[in-house]
Amino acid sequence: MASPREENVYMANVADEAERYEEMVEFMEKVVAALNGEELTVEERNLLSVAYKNVIGARRASWRIISSIEQKEESRGNEDHVASIKKYRSQIENELTSICNGILKLLDSKLIGSAATGDSKVFYLKMKGDYYRYLAEFKTGTERKEAAENTLSAYKSAQDIANGELAPTHPIRLGLALNFSVFYYEILNSPDRACNLAKQAFDEAIAELDTLGEESYKDSTLIMQLLRDNLTLWTSDMQDDGTDEIKEPSKADNE
């Protein structure tokens, strides 16, 4: 007979197939809650990541669309519409805050402390940085500053471990470099630092491409392509600065 942990993992897979991501989160939260100092398996940690990625991703997309509509209504001077949209945006921001706080609590209370291998430490610290970055996307004032500082701290801790313990071609190290560079570009408005970080990660991986095992070749080369796409986009944005055109969003890992 399957253990409760195995049953919850099985049901998380079923929920994933059915695209019922809120319930997938609930099943994986039960798995994490039952941990007693031991680690999640690679399959389990990936399921947790996929569940939260989809739950947060839907709301981040909604927030971007609503913010865009709000800007259009403001420019047209439709104050009544703007007031209604602000209220609606606030509702989505409350949902985003709740989701981010949920996974950040799990990471701090259960997952980061029990991570024993380099790749799991980097995986969870990167995840911590990602969810603080999502908070920084919509928070304002001191809350935004605090979220950005926490993002930077988590990504830097992850980077220190990744540079010491993971190969430049490792998909988790590459994914971290991708998301860290997006943070510099989108949140800190530091295009030079974003480009330098992305280019260094890409160049270091290219130099060791022949050492890549078959199992991670596809994952690594996909992230390398995203790094290159962002570099192309960012250098073109920097040259076009001052134009009013809508900028294409940067590409991040697992989003």
From Swiss-Prot:
Query: Membrane spanning segments where?
Result: none
Name one cellular component (GO) term: cytoplasm
- Note the superkingdom of the native organism: Eukaryota
SUPFAM superfamilies registered for this protein in UniProt: 14-3-3 protein
Q: Which Pfam families does the entry link to?
A: 14-3-3 (PF00244)
Q: Which InterPro entries match?
A: 14-3-3, 14-3-3_CS, 14-3-3_dom_sf, 14-3-3_domain
Q: Which GO terms describe its biological process?
A: protein localization; signal transduction
Kindly state the subunit structure of this protein: Homodimer.
| Record-stated family | Belongs to the 14-3-3 family.
Q: What is this protein called?
A: 14-3-3 protein 5
> Which species is listed as the source?
Solanum lycopersicum (Tomato)
